[in-house]
């Protein structure tokens, strides 16, 4: 997905003989720590495995009375935290502004959209397929959602987005890049903010390995010009740099999830043997909401 060296630099690589990385939730069956008892539900970096052993400081005890334990991997876990941090700290939202987020029904995008609505912004989503757009509007409360697969070019998508955002775009939460980025950039208002969380449309195309794909290189001067002329603030971030704020995130969001104010949607695949297929589907945009594997 990424050049291997780049992943290793971020601490995300997997050795040839290693266990595929990933967070997991489960029940303690043995413990040598006073902080955890047998039967406790925990979340930790166990990877793709049925059992795991982990140092106590790397675990988080879960309260199943607040929300299903699976939410520790989604709305109350790293994805939700990513959306919260990017929106609140880098988006710097102001009531009455317009926000656009791609991958709007995923656990990050749906968090961003709901926070925007709660803060008094217009939330416009972009997703792949009519069913996902319906989910964005009906379940997550977006004002509108555009199906990017219905538009052949970024120019066509831009025209539809301009109609949905008559006052321009103040915050674009970047999850996908590619055609969507090229559509949004000319619509950004002066002083706009772009938190960069992901670039998923480029991961399989080679564009991040030094080979421009689909005209991305040709459009680069126009993108840079927009950044300059519009005085845009663009911030890439890796959420693992900001774990010190995770407790603040939980204190804010957990009560809102328990009250039904922040909603979530899970796409559950049964069986660890089906995890590779589920991952491929995720990268191809086939999942709805947070992709999970249930053992």
Describe these PLM feature segments.
Residues 35-36, 93, 188:
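Short, well-ordered loop/turn sites that connect or cap secondary structure elements
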Residues 41, 98, 122, 192-193, ...:
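Short glycine-centered segments of the SAM/dcSAM-binding site in methyltransferase folds
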Residues 109-110:
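N-terminal Rossmann-fold NAD(P) dinucleotide-binding loop
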Residues 117-183, 240:
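Adenosine-nucleotide cofactor-binding segment
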Residues 179-262, 295:
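Glycine-rich phosphate-binding loop and adjacent beta-alpha segment
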Residues 259-268, 276-295:
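C-terminal capping/lid region of NAD(P)-dependent oxidoreductase domains
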């Amino acid at each position: 997905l990424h050049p291997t060296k780049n992943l290793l630099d971020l601490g995300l690589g997997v050795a040839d003989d290693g266990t595929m990385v990933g967070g997991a939730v489960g029940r303690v069956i043995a413990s040598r720590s006073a902080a955890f008892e047998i039967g406790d539900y925990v979340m930790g970096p166990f990877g793709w495995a049925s059992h795991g052993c982990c140092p106590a400081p790397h675990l988080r005890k879960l309260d199943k009375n607040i929300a299903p334990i699976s939410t520790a991997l989604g709305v109350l876990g790293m994805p939700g935290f990513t959306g919260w941090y990017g929106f609140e700290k880098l988006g710097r939202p102001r009531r009455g502004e317009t926000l656009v987020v791609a991958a709007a029904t995923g656990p990050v995008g749906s968090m961003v959209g709901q926070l925007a609505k709660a803060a008094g912004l217009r939330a416009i989503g972009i997703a792949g397929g009519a069913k996902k757009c319906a989910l964005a509007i009906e379940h997550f409360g977006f004002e509108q959602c555009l199906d990017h697969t219905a538009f052949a070019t970024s120019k066509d998508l831009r025209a539809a987005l301009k109609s949905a955002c008559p006052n321009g775009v103040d915050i674009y939460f970047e999850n996908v890049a590619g055609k969507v980025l090229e559509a949004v950039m000319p619509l950004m208002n002066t002083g706009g903010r772009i938190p960069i969380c992901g670039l998923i449309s480029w991961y399989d195309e080679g564009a991040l390995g030094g080979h421009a794909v689909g005209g991305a290189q040709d459009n680069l001067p126009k993108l840079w010009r927009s950044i300059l002329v519009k005085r845009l603030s663009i911030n890439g971030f890796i959420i693992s740099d900001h774990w010190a704020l995770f407790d603040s995130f939980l204190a804010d969001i957990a009560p809102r999830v328990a009250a039904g104010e922040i909603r979530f949607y899970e796409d559950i695949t049964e069986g660890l043997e089906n995890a590779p297929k589920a991952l491929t589907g995720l990268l191809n945009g086939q999942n709805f909401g947070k992709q999970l594997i249930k053992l």
